[in-house]
């Protein structure tokens, strides 16, 4: 799996912005990716040193629109903690 296939998109929420103060950045990642693959992908794409990776799997919620039933998509979220000597991720720095 390529690094750009593993990292799907960043998560921009109030909570993720607060975590950036602790050098933690949040991403939606491929459901099949493990912590080692996520770490390598972030280091390759953003050129930073990763200290730790936390992952969470979210199940899709059932939704209904009139008589039509369905589910929201299941996804995997990763919180990546950068090493103390590493620089921040430039993409997120402009958002603070």
Curated annotation (Swiss-Prot):
Pfam families: Ribosomal_L23. Gene3D superfamilies: 3.30.70.330. Keywords: Ribonucleoprotein, Ribosomal protein, RNA-binding, rRNA-binding. One of its GO terms (molecular function) is rRNA binding. InterPro entries: Nucleotide-bd_a/b_plait_sf, Ribosomal_uL23-like, Ribosomal_uL23/eL15/eS24_sf, Ribosomal_uL23_CS. One of its GO terms (cellular component) is ribosome. PROSITE patterns: RIBOSOMAL_L23. The keyword RNA-binding applies. It comes from the Bacteria. GO terms for biological process: translation. Part of the 50S ribosomal subunit. Contacts protein L29, and trigger factor when it is bound to the ribosome. HAMAP family: Ribosomal_uL23_B. One of the early assembly proteins it binds 23S rRNA. One of the proteins that surrounds the polypeptide exit tunnel on the outside of the ribosome. Forms the main docking site for trigger factor binding to the ribosome. Belongs to the universal ribosomal protein uL23 family. This is Large ribosomal subunit protein uL23. It comes from Caldanaerobacter subterraneus subsp. tengcongensis (strain DSM 15242 / JCM 11007 / NBRC 100824 / MB4). The gene is rplW.
């Amino acid at each position: 799996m390529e690094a750009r296939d593993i990292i799907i998109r960043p998560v921009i929420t109030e909570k993720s912005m607060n975590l950036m103060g602790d050098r933690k950045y949040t991403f939606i990642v491929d459901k099949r990716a493990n912590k080692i693959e996520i770490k390598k992908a972030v280091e390759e794409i953003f050129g930073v040193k990763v200290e730790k990776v936390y992952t969470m799997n979210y199940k899709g919620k059932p939704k209904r629109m009139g008589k039509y039933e369905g589910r929201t998509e299941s996804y995997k979220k990763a919180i990546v903690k950068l090493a103390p000597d590493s620089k921040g991720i430039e993409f997120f720095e402009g958002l603070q």
